[in-house]
Amino acid sequence: AAMMRTKGEAGTGNVVSAIQHARLVAGEIEWLQQASDLEFEGAVEDVTDGFMRLESMSPLIDYELISTPFGDLNTLSDGVRDVLEEVRKMGRLPVVTFSAGGIATPADAALMMQTGMDGIFVGSGIFKSEDPTTTAEAIVMATAHFEDPSKITEASAMMATPMPGLEIDTLEVRMDQRGN
């Protein structure tokens, strides 16, 4: 992989799920760093087993797993172990990590950067703001200066009305409830 994307609730203007997902990733990295050798090998096995389950995911197709991003099936465990060792050593994912979903204001963008993201994606929800162009410029400014409260304040002041936020509890289907 060249990058990783964490995901909040797209189209909501509500950054809560994005923050929760970023914290989950950070927590799992921290767990990996503190894991005993036995726990670490258990994590390698869990990831490896996830790939092996792919063959049985759909009864509609005859799918044979030949290779994975970590190599062929014979070297799968070694590849997973190598990547998890790298994560353990670096204390972060070995690829850039972007966040998406619910990021609608400069403050949201800065907050995601402060949680350790390398960047953010802003979706079509930006067009629900009063002035999408200025909103985009303000979010870019806050992202670039996420450690400078005065710049974040300045970026926030640039904006007109952002997209209206939706409460996640009111959604019929949530991102975290989709798929397997």
What would you call each of these model-derived segments?
Residues 7-11, 37, 66, 96, ...:
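Active-site beta-loop-alpha junctions enriched in small/polar residues
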Residues 13-29, 128-151, 163-167:
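C-terminal helical cap(s) of enzyme catalytic domains, especially alpha/beta-barrels
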Residues 18, 97, 112, 123, ...:
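Conserved, mostly hydrophobic/aromatic
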Residues 37-41, 152-180:
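A short, charged, Gly/Pro-tolerant segment at domain boundaries
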Residues 1-94:
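Conserved anion-binding
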Residues 1, 8, 67, 93-105, ...:
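Active-site mouth loops of central-metabolism enzymes
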Residues 82-86, 104-113:
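A short, acidic, amphipathic alpha-helical segment used as a generic capping/interface helix at domain edges
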Residues 2-16, 102, 115-135, 179:
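Glycine-rich phosphate-binding active-site loops on the catalytic face of alpha/beta enzymes
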